[in-house]
Amino acid sequence: MIFQNFAPLAIDTSTNVAMVAIENPLLTAFSKVIAVSFDTISLVVISVIISAYFFYRNQSKKELFFASMMVVTGAVIYFLKELFQRVRPMNQLMAETNFGFPSGHATASTVFVFLLAYLYTKDKSNETRKKVYWAAGVVALIVGFTRIYLRAHWLTDVLAGFVAAALILVGAIFVEKRF
């Protein structure tokens, strides 16, 4: 589309080489488990369960907010991938066939864990909020690292996914506070 043939940057290729250098079976197995745990199907299933829980608890505002933001996230990811049409690294440890920029795993998992953190901690103490947000950040970073380690993405794909997630979250919280 507009940004077709968006080539990897020097930092992308050097990071890719570094991931080859640290490759080992245990880290590969762990990374594949994380990849499957935070793929589209897994996040959709978990999101439906969480939305059903909110519905069951008569928290329809949370249900609608959470479900709609996950749908918006999916749409943003699809739009950006089609806009940039960036090819993934050739030496993948886990084959992916669609475009790579931004990382859908990094974007969706970051929105997912931080939305849950936001909804869970709204009525909690500052200490609890800090712990929950730190945990969400660690999960997001692990997902991002595994995408780079598996060479399913360039470093900048993952960083762009984090930026997209941050923008989605800021927009989501802005809208949620007004309604």
Protein language model features and the residues they cover:
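Hydrophobic core of alpha-helical transmembrane segments in multi-pass integral membrane proteins
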Residues: 1-2, 47-53
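N-terminal transmembrane-helix/juxtamembrane module of multi-pass inner/ER membrane proteins
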Residues: 1-42, 82-92
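Short helix-capping/hinge motifs at transmembrane helix termini and TM-loop junctions
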Residues: 3-5, 57-58, 84-85, 150-151, ...
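Membrane-interface loops
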Residues: 10, 46-47, 56-126
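Alpha-helical transmembrane segments of multi-pass membrane proteins, especially transporters
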Residues: 17, 65-70, 158-162
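Membrane-interface helix-boundary signature
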Residues: 28-31, 63, 126-133
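Hydrophobic alpha-helical transmembrane segments of polytopic
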Residues: 43-46, 50, 70, 132, ...
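Membrane-embedded catalytic cores of phosphoryl/pyrophosphoryl-handling enzymes
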Residues: 90-179
